[in-house]
Amino acid sequence: MLWSWYMSNDTQFYALAIIILLVSVKYFRVAAGAVIFFLVSSWATTIMVSLHYGYRARIQDPFAMFDELYDKPWTRLGPYLVGMFAGWFLLRSKNKIKMSLSTTVIGWFLSLATLFCLVYGLHLTTLEAWGSALYVSVGHTAWGAALAWIVIACCTGYGGCINSALSFRMLQPLSRLTYCAYLVHPVIMVATSFQMDGPMHIHNALTLILYFGN
C-alpha cells in the first residue's frame, strides 16, 4: 500500500506519545527531557543518513532517497513532537493567552515566511552536502512549528481572517473526509494508471485535471 509508511509511523508515534504523556503526569521534567532528546536525536540521525548517502536537496526531485530519508520514523518524529507540545500548551493554557500586537505580527510573519521558504526556498538553488543535511533534518520540524503557530494563534483569538477561513462551516464536511481521501485516492490513481495504454504527456490542462481530481 502506498500509504503504509505513514500509517506505520503514525502508529509508532501514537504509542510513544501515550508513554510520554503518562510519564508527564507525575514526572514532567523527565517527559520534557525525553521530548527534547527524541527531537535532537531525530535531527542528528537524519543529518548522518543524509551525509552518508550524499543527499542533495533539489526541488526537481523532492522524493529522492524516499526509503532512506522520507518515510523512516526516526526522520519524521520532529513535527509529531511539535504537535504534541502545541496540544499540551493549548490544554494547559485553556486557549487563553495574552500576546502583544508586536508578538502576534512577528509570530505570523515567521510562520508564513517559514512555510514559504520551505516550499520555494530550493528554487534555483543548489545546496551542498551539509546544507542539504540541515534542510532535510530540520525542514519537517520547521513546517510543523509554523503550522503549530497557526493553530495556537487561531485557538487563542489571534487568527483574524485566517481563523475565519479555516473555521468556515462549509469546510467542516470536507475536513472530515481528508484522511479517507488519503487512503482511497492512491488506489484510484494506481487503478487509473493500470488502464493507460501509453505514457501521459504533461501539459497545463492535464495538470489541472490531475490536481483537482486527486
Regions found by a protein language model. Name each.
Residues 6-15, 34-38, 176-184, 211-214:
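Transmembrane alpha-helical segments and their boundary/interface "anchor" motifs
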Residues 1-5, 19-144:
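Aromatic-enriched alpha-helical transmembrane segments of multi-pass intramembrane proteins
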Residues 76, 80, 84-86, 106-214:
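Alpha-helical transmembrane segments of multi-pass integral membrane proteins
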